[in-house]
Amino acid sequence: MLLEGSCHCGAVRFRVVSPHPYPFNRCYCSICRKTAGGGGYAINLSGDADTLVVHGAEHTSIYQAEIDGLTSPGERHFCSRCASALWVFDPRWPELVHPFASAIDSDLPRPPERVHLMLENKPDWVEIESREQDRCFAGYPDESIAEWHARLGLEEG
């Protein structure tokens, strides 16, 4: 599926092909929550890094979080004009890019189940909107974004 996204002010527009377009993964870690999660969580999708096309790249900046005193290799791209979170790239998985669902303008499919992860970092004010079929994890689940899509038969060609 072709995902098209943008920042709030329109200075940055991008597109990327994603075989895994379902916005199912709700991350409650402090990094996602504070950089992109207005509801107490952020939703990352998965795309093919080789297909990422960015217009207005001169208006992007990168934030790399510190975790336990070490700089994370994950590069969180955001608009330097309006601060919209756009995507995450991690050189440990150079074939992937993870756009934030909040930056996607394309219609996304509704997931049949959701995964709530990093719940050990969730603040008390955040209420989990969990459905019966949803899965909840204190940390990271063992299943990747691609594996979740494959298990449910939702991979796109």
Swiss-Prot record:
Alphabetic keyword roster: Lyase, Metal-binding, Zinc
Pathway assignment: One-carbon metabolism; formaldehyde degradation; formate from formaldehyde (glutathione route): step 1/3
Top-level lineage group: Bacteria
Binding site for Zn(2+) 1: 7, 9, 79, 82
Sample GO molecular function, one term: S-(hydroxymethyl)glutathione synthase activity
Any one Gene Ontology BP term: formaldehyde catabolic process
Residues the entry annotates as binding Zn(2+) 2: 27, 29, 32
InterPro entries: CENP-V/GFA, Mss4-like_sf
Lyase in keyword set: yes
Cofactor note: Binds 2 Zn(2+) ions per subunit.
Reaction(s) this enzyme catalyzes, per UniProt: S-(hydroxymethyl)glutathione = glutathione + formaldehyde
EC number, as in UniProt: 4.4.1.22
Coiled-coil intervals, chain numbering: none
Domain CENP-V/GFA intervals: 3-134
Cofactor: Zn(2+)
Family, similarity comment: Belongs to the Gfa family.
Biological role stated in the UniProt entry: Catalyzes the condensation of formaldehyde and glutathione to S-hydroxymethylglutathione.
Protein name: Putative glutathione-dependent formaldehyde-activating enzyme
